[in-house]
């Protein structure tokens, strides 16, 4: 079972199935659980272009591995958590094989990321289409929906 703070490695069909996020696995932080599913923020390696003002992600949290013990984060390089978009994954269960090692970020980081999201009134909510996400990540499992079936004797 996944919990808030876990870091997953997924291919995501955004903005479409041919995009960079769909071609190569990226890390996503499981930030919040709602009725509509799991909210995930994409992570990206920090690049020189990110030092310039106005370069997306505009709302971001930076993780610098050299400043924290390895147990607080699975990231090996300077990483930006993109708080401009929150992807929602629903109707699937995530196997442990898609989690990083260590599997999560520390609580302190998660709280800071959620505060950035709270302060960002324009955070885009993006629901992920279940068939596309499963076709890119076959180890994801469809969740069985509870139904009110009456069993006859």
Feature map (PLM): residue ranges:
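Compact nucleic-acid interaction/catalytic patches
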Residues: 17-25, 30-69
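C-terminal terminal-subdomain/extension
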Residues: 63-153
């Amino acid at each position: 079972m996944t919990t808030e703070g876990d870091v997953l490695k997924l291919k995501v069909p955004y903005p479409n199935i041919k995009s960079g996020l769909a071609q190569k696995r990226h890390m996503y932080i499981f930030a919040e659980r709602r009725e509509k599913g799991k909210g995930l923020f994409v992570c990206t390696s920090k690049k020189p272009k990110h030092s310039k003002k106005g370069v997306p992600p505009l709302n971001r949290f930076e993780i610098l591995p050299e400043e924290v013990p390895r147990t607080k984060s699975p990231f090996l390089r300077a990483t930006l958590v993109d708080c401009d978009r929150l992807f929602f994954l629903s109707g699937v269960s995530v196997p442990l094989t898609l989690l990083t090692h260590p599997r999560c970020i520390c609580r302190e980081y998660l709280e800071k990321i959620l505060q950035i999201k709270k302060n960002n009134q324009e955070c885009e909510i993006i629901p992920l289409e279940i068939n596309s996400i499963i076709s890119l990540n076959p180890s994801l499992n469809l969740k069985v929906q509870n139904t009110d079936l009456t069993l006859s004797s």
